[in-house]
């Protein structure tokens, strides 16, 4: 009997727990062997009793198999070749639980199976796992793997490492086994990070000499792809010294001719990276993003930082993304834990997950596919806490505390080790710290490795040619530290004193941007470049405006 006057009353009920309960019920059916209507069999003979509807809901492969006019449509048992039972078990469990465990041991086999069986979400998760663990040791193999399985993000990011760190890549054992086609692909990249002819000729000679009988004729083609000037004297010397090539004088002369007169060679400098200037300070916080190509000396402006009232933040880049972490507001000195992420490909900002600890005047670096935030200030005192953001897990995780909390220090990464140099210590920066702290992520441990000859704060550090270079600060002194030899040496002094400047490695040189000159009492707009071969600094351009405390990173666009 209808309630009087309520005939049009409708209540739309939705049980939010129903999807979970539904999945749990099918998981129970699977575990108990209830209502199953299809059996999957591995090459090892292990079988899994499943439900067609569940498999079809997760896999386009099984959906097509069970709905199209195929013989498997009517079979009760499907034999799957080439898939290990552990991998198939993981995919079947995923179908019933929405969860799967991905490890370094199983990720490639799991991606291959997910690609074959079209478990698209699992394939994407495996791809992101591999991107997270990319490095110079595996980027060549991962690039080929990504091409074969059509993993666009993995292909792009492995190519980014391959091109941006080519000098390190070609010294890996994996490089000697690459195919001619892969080598030609590498050499044909317009953004390949090579700036000197020996930097590209040496890997060509090394690769050829590794299998001289089968590769000697390939060298004609390889040399023709080198898009920089080739000195015939150098080429002749390099080929002649590589005795394993067993080249006659006539063949060397022929190689030189072909290298200097190729069909498709365009002799030009390669722009290997683009500089990004993020925010900064000029009497007040700056919110602009400026982008510079050093070859054309052209500046363009990107999307502004959404949170434009902060200063003294940390900036680092991971792939195409630039992370801005922490800082403090101009109207107070309360440390911030907020994070903003700038995507250089889309020219857009998104807010990231907040850090575990608020901090300002801290160091930010990238290591092993993660973003690290180290030390800094909080409530006027230097903080020892350090943490990292794992983009795959989408969370910040703590690491061991620093030996000494420092603010306004500098940090960089060399050979998978983080170095934190100098900075302020003591309440409100009452002391300058003279030690270099290093962090080994494999054992989650900090060490004191050396003392700086000139303790400083507000300076920058960059890794270059297996050494650390320290620039900026209150003096023009430039120092170079060799971790392997544990030795310091001074190089040519800079042209300006640059407190809280920016510094990056681009095109085989060190670029230092902006800063504040205490001797002149002015903010600086100029850009200095250091050529390590000449041991010389020169002014090469200007920032769009004078500034200090800005982010300065380079992104290899692919």
UniProtKB/Swiss-Prot annotation:
UniProt keyword ATP-binding, yes or no: no
Alphabetically ordered keywords of this record: Kelch repeat, Repeat
SMART domains: BACK, BTB, Kelch
Domain BACK, first and last residues per copy: 139-240
Residues spanning the membrane: none
Residue ranges of Kelch repeats: 274-320, 321-369, 370-416, 418-466, 467-508, 510-557
Residue ranges annotated for the BTB domain, each copy included: 36-104
Protein name (database record): Kelch-like protein 23
Organism: Mus musculus (Mouse)
């Amino acid at each position: 009997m209808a309630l009087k006057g309520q005939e049009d009353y409708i209540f739309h009920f939705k049980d939010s727990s129903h999807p979970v309960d539904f999945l749990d019920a099918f998981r129970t059916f699977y575990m108990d062997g209830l209502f199953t209507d299809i059996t999957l069999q591995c090459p090892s003979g292990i079988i899994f009793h499943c439900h067609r509807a569940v498999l079809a809901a997760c896999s386009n492969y099984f959906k097509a198999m069970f709905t199209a006019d195929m013989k498997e449509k009517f079979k009760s048992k499907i034999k799957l070749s080439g898939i290990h039972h552990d991998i198939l078990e993981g995919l079947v469990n995923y179908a019933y639980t929405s969860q799967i465990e991905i490890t370094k041991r199983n990720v490639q086999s799991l991606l291959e199976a997910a690609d074959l069986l079209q478990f698209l979400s699992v394939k994407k998760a495996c791809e992101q796992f591999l991107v997270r663990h990319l490095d110079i040791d595996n980027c060549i193999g991962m690039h080929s793997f990504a091409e074969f399985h059509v993993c666009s993000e993995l292909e792009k990011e492995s190519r980014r490492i391959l091109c941006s760190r080519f000098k390190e890549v070609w010294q890996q054992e994996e490089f000697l086994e690459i195919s001619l086609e892969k080598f030609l692909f590498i050499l044909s990249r317009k953004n390949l990070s090579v700036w000197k002819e020996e930097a590209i000729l040496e890997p060509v000679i090394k690769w050829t000499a590794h299998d001289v009988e089968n590769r000697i004729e390939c060298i004609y083609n390889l040399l023709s792809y080198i898009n920089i000037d080739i000195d015939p004297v150098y080429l002749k010397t390099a080929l002649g010294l590589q005795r394993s090539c067993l080249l006659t004088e006539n063949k060397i002369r022929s190689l030189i001719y072909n290298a200097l007169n190729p069909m498709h060679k365009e002799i030009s400098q390669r722009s290997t990276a683009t500089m990004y200037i993020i925010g900064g300070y000029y009497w007040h916080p700056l919110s602009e993003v400026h982008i510079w190509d050093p070859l054309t000396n052209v500046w363009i402006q990107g999307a502004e930082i959404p949170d434009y009232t902060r200063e003294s933040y940390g900036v680092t880049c991971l792939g195409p993304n630039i992370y801005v972490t922490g800082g403090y507001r101009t109207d107070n000195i309360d440390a911030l834990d907020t994070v903003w992420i700038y995507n250089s490909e889309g020219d857009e900002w998104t807010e990231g997950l907040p850090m575990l600890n608020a901090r300002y005047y801290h160091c930010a670096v990238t290591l092993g596919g993660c973003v690290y935030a180290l030390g800094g200030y909080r409530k006027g005192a230097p903080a020892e806490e350090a943490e990292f953001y794992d983009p795959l897990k989408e969370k910040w995780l703590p690491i061991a505390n620093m030996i000494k909390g420092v603010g306004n220090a500098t940090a960089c990464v060399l050979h998978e080790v983080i170095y934190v140099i100098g900075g302020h210590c003591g309440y409100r920066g009452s002391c300058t710290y003279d030690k270099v702290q290093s962090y080994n992520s494999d054992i989650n441990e900090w060490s004191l490795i050396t003392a700086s000859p000139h303790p400083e704060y507000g300076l920058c550090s960059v890794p270059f040619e297996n050494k650390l270079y320290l620039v900026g600060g209150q003096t023009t002194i430039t120092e170079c530290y060799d971790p392997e030899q544990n030795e310091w040496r001074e190089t040519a002094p800079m042209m300006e004193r640059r407190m809280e400047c920016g510094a990056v490695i681009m095109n085989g040189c060190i670029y230092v941007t902006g800063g504040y000159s205490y001797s002149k009492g002015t903010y600086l707009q100029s850009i200095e470049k250091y050529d390590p071969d000449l041991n010389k600094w020169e002014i090469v351009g200007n920032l769009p405006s004078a500034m200090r405390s800005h982010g300065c990173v380079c992104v290899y666009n692919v």
